[in-house]
Swiss-Prot record:
GO terms for biological process: biotin biosynthetic process; methylation. HAMAP family: BioC. The gene is bioC. Its EC number is 2.1.1.197. Converts the free carboxyl group of a malonyl-thioester to its methyl ester by transfer of a methyl group from S-adenosyl-L-methionine (SAM). It allows to synthesize pimeloyl-ACP via the fatty acid synthetic pathway. Pathway: Cofactor biosynthesis; biotin biosynthesis. This is Malonyl-[acyl-carrier protein] O-methyltransferase. Belongs to the methyltransferase superfamily. SUPFAM superfamilies: S-adenosyl-L-methionine-dependent methyltransferases. Pfam families: Methyltransf_11. The keyword Hydrolase does not apply. PANTHER family: TRANS-ACONITATE 2-METHYLTRANSFERASE, TRANS-ACONITATE 2-METHYLTRANSFERASE-RELATED.
Length: 270
């Protein structure tokens, strides 16, 4: 699904939740890219203890166990827009008795002001509609001196898909992610202090164009317009796959992402 002006915010969030609900059972089997990003993000944690940790966009809980082990929190908050993702996470970590599973929108957090020592989020905030509003909300719930550590997709992700579609039609088939500079400007405008940021190109490789697209769909991140879009005919879809196949090299079919890794902090004095 593409985010367009004619899709209301509520409708968009409902569709997003349904998409990730459908992917909840297959997510872990296809989340190779997500695991690579998570490992790098965890290495950027600026603290070794935190009383209250919010895992924003927890999904199936890939980060929950690691955060709990490393930070020894008194309270974990696993928050996601998808109820089915939370169900998988809660079953997976049923032994974490200090963990609360919350189905909510990241842009409207049902949390008290200054309640969290750390907000951790891997590959979730790219689905938010207003980054500035999101960061203001994170500023609100973070304690003075607390941290926001996140990764997100940035402009230039999945160029292989855009290239394969080029010339076949004039439509956007990949979500237009925010430019890294604009993302950092939003963080600064929220009054969070930007401590560090990295923009990295991460490439994954597949046996076929179909398997590359499947890897998106099975984690709920299918952004190909043909997914439920009757305007893409079978013949046009076949033409797309043939164009994508032309990008094969000795490693296979590429699918690459621009990933922003960010550490920010709420000032101690505010």
């Amino acid at each position: 699904m593409l985010i367009t002006p004619d899709i209301s915010a509520l409708s968009y969030k409902r569709q997003l939740a349904k998409r990730f609900d459908r992917a909840s059972q297959s997510y872990d089997s296809y989340a190779d890219f997500q695991k690579v990003v998570l490992e790098r993000l965890l290495a950027m944690l600026p603290l070794n203890q935190a009383d209250v940790v919010l895992d924003l966009g927890t999904g199936t809980g890939q980060a929950l166990g690691i955060l709990s082990e490393r930070l020894n929190p008194k309270c974990n908050i696993a928050l996601d827009l998808s109820l089915q993702m939370l169900a998988v996470a809660s079953e997976r970590f049923s032994s974490l008795h200090n963990t609360h599973y919350v189905c909510a929108d990241a842009e409207r957090l049902p949390l008290q002001d200054r309640s969290c020592d750390l907000v951790f989020s891997s590959l979730a905030i790219q689905w938010c509609l207003s980054p500035l509003d999101l960061f203001k909300e994170l500023y609100r719930v973070i304690k003075p001196g607390g941290y926001v550590v996140f990764s997100t997709l940035s402009q230039g992700s999945m160029p292989e898909i855009s290239k394969a579609w080029f010339g076949l039609d004039n439509k956007e088939h990949v979500h237009q992610y925010m430019a890294s500079d604009a993302l950092l400007d939003s963080i600064r405008a929220s009054e969070l202090n930007l401590l560090s940021s990295q923009l990295s190109n991460i490439s994954m490789w597949f046996d076929s164009p179909e398997s590359a697209i499947y890897s998106l769909k099975k984690v709920g991140a299918s952004l190909i317009a043909s997914d439920g879009d009757p305007s893409v005919s079978p013949s046009k879809w076949k033409a797309f796959l043939l164009e994508y196949e032309k990008q094969r090299n000795e490693l296979g079919i590429p699918l690459s992402y621009q990933v922003s890794f960010v550490v920010a902090q709420r000032p101690n004095s505010i």
